[in-house]
């Protein structure tokens, strides 16, 4: 048996997509892609330049934050985006787009955003890798010399354990039959029509 996949992958971002992007769909909807919170020379600099370019550009009443395939990273890197989106959420609606490749710091970031008003998560359940992990890749050989273990060096909060291995379920699930951003735009327009 082989699972039949669609010709077009609507769930994941294309491999060659930029890590950071801001664009407007129309006057009512803006889109923000953050594909990493990693802190290394290349991504930290790119993230800071990108952040500086967008920090005064969030104007639409609806905002899609695309965290699909976000590989996680450092809390310090996510903090600036959280502050920006927290301020924005007081006047606009946030739609957080997630998939099974949204993990680690992206999941923690999502839980923080969910505490704000006007936030809806959409997509699919996240990876469930937010309490344990290794930033430094330290291995320890056991006394027998036969086995080696890979230790966690992260201090996860007990409140995050409920999501470990299970992930964060979205408020609204999306199907894999059509473009996910277009599905979110449809949700926004439908909600706008009810107001």
PLM region spans:
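Low-complexity, Gly/Ser/Thr/Pro-rich intrinsically disordered linker/tail segments
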Residues: 161-195
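Pocket-edge structural micro-motifs
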Residues: 33-34, 98, 123, 144, ...
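C-terminal "exit" segments of structured domains
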Residues: 134-158
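Cleft-lining beta-strand/loop regions that shape enzyme active-site pockets
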Residues: 1-141
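A short, polar/proline- and glycine-enriched secondary-structure boundary/capping micro-motif
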Residues: 42-44, 160-163
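Generic "edge-of-domain/loop-turn" microfeature
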Residues: 39, 72, 103, 147, ...
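Short, intrinsically disordered/low-complexity patches at protein termini
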Residues: 88-89, 144-146, 174, 186-188
């Amino acid at each position: 048996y082989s699972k039949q996949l669609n010709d077009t992958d609507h769930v994941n971002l294309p491999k060659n997509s930029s890590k950071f992007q801001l664009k407007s769909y129309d006057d009512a909807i803006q889109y923000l892609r953050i594909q990493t919170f990693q802190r290394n020379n290349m991504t930290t600099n790119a993230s800071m330049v990108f952040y500086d370019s967008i920090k005064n550009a969030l104007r639409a009443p609806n905002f899609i934050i695309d965290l699909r395939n976000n590989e996680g990273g450092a809390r310090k890197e996510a903090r600036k985006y959280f502050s920006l989106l927290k301020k924005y959420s007081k006047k606009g609606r946030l739609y957080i787009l997630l998939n099974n490749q949204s993990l680690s710091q992206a999941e923690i970031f999502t839980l923080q955003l969910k505490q704000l008003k006007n936030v809806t998560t959409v997509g699919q359940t996240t990876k469930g890798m937010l309490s344990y992990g290794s930033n430094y890749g330290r291995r320890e050989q056991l006394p027998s010399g036969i086995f080696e273990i890979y230790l966690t060096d992260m201090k996860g909060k007990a409140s995050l354990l409920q999501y470990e291995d299970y992930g964060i379920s979205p408020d609204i699930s999306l199907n894999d039959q059509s473009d996910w951003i277009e599905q979110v735009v449809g949700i926004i327009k439908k909600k706008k029509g009810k107001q």
